[in-house]
């Protein structure tokens, strides 16, 4: 017989259903942490399975590698699957990523974000028409990609950026710019000049004011602000 005392945590979750006339509101759920996994995503899944099947959110890998479960937890953009439940608190507040159109509950519309990602042409460019060999890199060139390729496109950084809040129709944002630099610095890519010329724009790149929210919030501990600064440096070297 389990006589362990309940350890109740309140989860206050943003709710909005476009199919109903209700305004957005907060629903509060009680969860016994003794029968719940350690991560916020565990609590959300438990709530959906046991209390409210209408609660809607994205999730997939549960390992911090897909970026699906990005949301704002206690004021910080992060991934719910790798965000530990703070057992020192009595409640946690969960909202969708800020300044985004919401599809339902904790699900933001990422259509514009993905369109911006597509615009930087995130694939290797080569001037050779026929390839019959691999593109080799030195160890040093390969190491230049560290801190870049790990980005999971969760949009936590971009949606934490005030410049992106106000100019998301023109400013590419820290996530997409970090991805752009990932290809600019890749020694195997042959489209560097073309990429830099595309980014040399007062809005696409230069809306970054080095606020550093992006670097602070990144759940993968990457540094988008540094990548953006290096893009600017590379542009100054164009002749």
From Swiss-Prot:
GO molecular function: 2 iron, 2 sulfur cluster binding; 3 iron, 4 sulfur cluster binding; 4 iron, 4 sulfur cluster binding; electron transfer activity; metal ion binding; succinate dehydrogenase (quinone) activity
Keywords: 2Fe-2S, 3Fe-4S, 4Fe-4S, Electron transport, Iron, Iron-sulfur, Membrane, Metal-binding, Mitochondrion, Mitochondrion inner membrane, Oxidoreductase, Transport, Tricarboxylic acid cycle
Entry keyword S-adenosyl-L-methionine: no
Binding residue positions for [4Fe-4S] cluster: 151, 154, 157, 218
Listed GO biological process terms: respiratory electron transport chain; tricarboxylic acid cycle
Cofactor(s) required, per the database record: [2Fe-2S] cluster; [3Fe-4S] cluster; [4Fe-4S] cluster
Family that this chain belongs to: Belongs to the succinate dehydrogenase/fumarate reductase iron-sulfur protein family.
Protein name (record): Succinate dehydrogenase [ubiquinone] iron-sulfur subunit
Taxonomic source organism: Reclinomonas americana
Lineage: Eukaryota, Discoba, Jakobida, Histionina, Histionidae
